[in-house]
């Protein structure tokens, strides 16, 4: 699963995504992409599940790019622990996805296969998405 090699800080604030994405809003590598419509927190496990679903649908043909990286540590308290006594320990990593952000890109496969693969990947993600294509 995706996780940063080094971190500057062990724990992070919860945070919110309040504005639209400023960078990563256009296709950079592939001819088809999966663009977010909502703002939400996507975990490393959800990204990996989307990647597996898309590559399985593509039958290992073509190329898939993941344009988001989980760099925010999410902490959690253990079960049946009272409130207070500090913040919980980091459990997993996530990325805050803003509306308009390209999350996955595909190239090297037919259009119907690429669209089907991106639809499968979008079912694994907690954000509403739209499939975009490159027009030359």
Swiss-Prot record:
One Gene Ontology term of the molecular function aspect: tRNA binding
Pfam families (alphabetical): Ribosomal_L16
GO biological process, one term: translation
Record's keyword terms, sorted: Ribonucleoprotein, Ribosomal protein, RNA-binding, rRNA-binding, tRNA-binding
GO cellular component: cytosolic large ribosomal subunit
Cytoplasm as UniProt keyword: no
Domain of life of the native organism: Bacteria
Keyword DNA-binding: no
Cysteines paired by S-S bonds: none
Alphabetized Gene3D superfamilies for the sequence: Ribosomal protein L10e/L16
Homology family: Belongs to the universal ribosomal protein uL16 family.
Functional description taken from the UniProt entry: Binds 23S rRNA and is also seen to make contacts with the A and possibly P site tRNAs.
HAMAP family: Ribosomal_uL16
NCBIfam families listed in its UniProt record: rplP_bact
Subunit structure of this chain's protein: Part of the 50S ribosomal subunit.
Name of protein: Large ribosomal subunit protein uL16
């Amino acid at each position: 699963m995706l996780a940063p090699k080094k971190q500057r800080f062990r724990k992070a604030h919860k945070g919110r995504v309040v504005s639209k994405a400023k960078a990563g809003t256009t296709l950079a590598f592939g001819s088809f992409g999966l663009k977010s419509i909502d703002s939400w927190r996507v975990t490393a496990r959800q990204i990996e599940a989307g990647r597996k679903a898309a590559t399985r649908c593509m039958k290992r043909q073509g190329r898939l790019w993941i344009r988001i990286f989980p760099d925010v540590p999410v902490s959690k308290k253990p079960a049946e622990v009272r409130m207070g006594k500090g913040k919980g320990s980091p459990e997993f990593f996530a990325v805050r996805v803003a509306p308009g952000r390209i999350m996955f890109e595909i190239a090297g496969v037919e259009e119907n296969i690429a669209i089907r693969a991106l639809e499968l990947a979008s079912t694994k993600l907690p954000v509403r998405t739209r499939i975009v294509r490159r027009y030359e």
